[in-house]
């Protein structure tokens, strides 16, 4: 995984390679999926949950640039793998399910870093309001049906996401835009 998926795709940050080399992906999938835990695409976990491809997590960590003074929120896809990768790299780590964010679940008021372990169609206020001023967010973003890795920063109370690269990130349907009729 380190040599054939991460390094060949430009993920070379030592802290990313060290963490991904030390956390066994097979511990985060059902017994029947252990043999495909390192495949270069998402592993379905059932019930709409998934373990994203190694490259997705590697690029997310690299773009997040976590620090020990970060208070961090991970919006989970259901595997717990991203949280385990990040835990020793940040000061405080909370996790929440995508459905809980969409439902407006209360929690810590602000975070310096938010990672969304999946792709979203839009960034809801329920999530952007949890990002402190000058805080960072790393997420998958669905644009015209294509998923991309995106980053953002909260400036003057507003978060703008900047797409970085097309990458196969499973969609978190709790963040789908309401369907509207149009010509």
Set out the residue ranges of the language-model regions.
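ADP-ribose/adenylate-binding Rossmann-like module
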Residues: 135-153
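Redox-cofactor binding/interface segments in oxidoreductases and associated redox assembly factors
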Residues: 74, 115-116, 139
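A short acidic, Gly/Pro-enriched loop at the edge of an enzyme's catalytic core
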Residues: 102-114, 121-122
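Short, well-ordered alpha-helical microsegments
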Residues: 83, 123-125
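Short, acidic/turn-prone active-site loops that include or flank metal/cofactor-
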Residues: 98-101, 120, 140-145
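Short glycine-dipeptide loop
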Residues: 69, 131-137
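Conserved helix-to-beta-strand junction in the class I
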Residues: 89, 129-130, 140
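Class I SAM-dependent transferase core
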Residues: 1-97, 153-176, 182-183
């Amino acid at each position: 995984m380190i040599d054939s998926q991460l390094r060949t795709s430009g993920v070379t940050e030592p802290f990313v390679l060290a963490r991904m080399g030390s956390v066994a992906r097979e511990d985060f999938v059902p017994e029947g999926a252990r043999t495909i835990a390192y495949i270069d695409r998402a592993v379905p976990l059932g019930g709409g949950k998934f373990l994203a491809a190694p490259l997705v997590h590697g690029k997310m960590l690299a773009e997040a640039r976590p620090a020990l003074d970060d208070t961090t929120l991970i919006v989970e896809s259901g595997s717990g793998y991203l949280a385990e990768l990040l835990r020793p790299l940040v000061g405080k780590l909370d996790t929440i399910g995508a459905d809980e964010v969409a439902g407006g679940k209360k929690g810590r008021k602000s975070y310096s870093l938010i990672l969304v372990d999946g792709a979203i169609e839009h960034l809801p206020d329920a999530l952007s309001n949890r990002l402190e001023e000058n805080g960072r967010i790393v997420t998958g973003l669905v644009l015209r049906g294509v998923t991309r890795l995106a980053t953002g920063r909260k400036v003057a109370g507003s978060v703008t996401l900047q797409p970085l690269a097309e990458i196969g990130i499973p969609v978190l349907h709790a963040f789908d835009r309401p369907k509207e009729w149009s010509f």
